[in-house]
């Protein structure tokens, strides 16, 4: 709820909000953008599961300072591994370009390099192995790029199929699962719901060779890496998802018959 988010904004005064569009569903972007403007907060969108989804007339991933997308093989499109990051802020985009490649300036043009070198008093010789940002080696390859560019052209078709499959699930399982969706155009990643007898349902799905999973990480504070290093956190709604959440598969190659 927006009131909960505003409470957190008031209490912690964050500089950045990282917003996850879970399984393709949009958040209330109008209200979130209002709060970001009011409290002068940068918005970063995790759009890894929502490529193609829209809120009103805007694509998810285009509202904040930056957004991330995953092209892992199980996602909307695949480059085998990797993904993309987007931003309409030129300076931030340049920083991301550097961070992707160790923090070097090797992907910058000559005038940009000289400007940064002069500002930081770095000689041309030193610049060949100077790390201007704390970076990573997460550069993509021509093969990954070719796969991504060829598939991004199909995203409207992929979105249409995934949305169709979601609606088939919704109709066929209406007596069992209640799912509300307010996303204008939904590029569904999976069909998620809450079930009290989740383990029993999971075993039945396995017998029928139907894959299903927990709703991503559930409550992140229940994950071992967090529990070992942080104080106990009270997140009752996330606990419910952690305990009862489950989602069924959705894919562009999944037919209506497969879904039923």
Task: Tell me the role of every PLM-derived stretch.
Residues 6-10, 16-20, 25-34, 38, ...:
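PLP-dependent aminotransferase class I/II
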Residues 15-16, 40-42, 59, 66, ...:
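Proline-centered loop/turn at the N-terminus of a beta-strand
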Residues 21, 44-45:
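Conserved short alpha-helical interface segments
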Residues 45-79, 94, 127-130:
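Conserved active-site segment immediately N-terminal to the catalytic lysine
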Residues 62, 87, 255:
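Ser/Thr-centric signal marking residues that sit
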Residues 69-70, 83-89, 116-119:
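Short beta-strand-to-turn element immediately C-terminal to the catalytic PLP-Schiff-base lysine
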Residues 78-83, 148:
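Adenylate-forming
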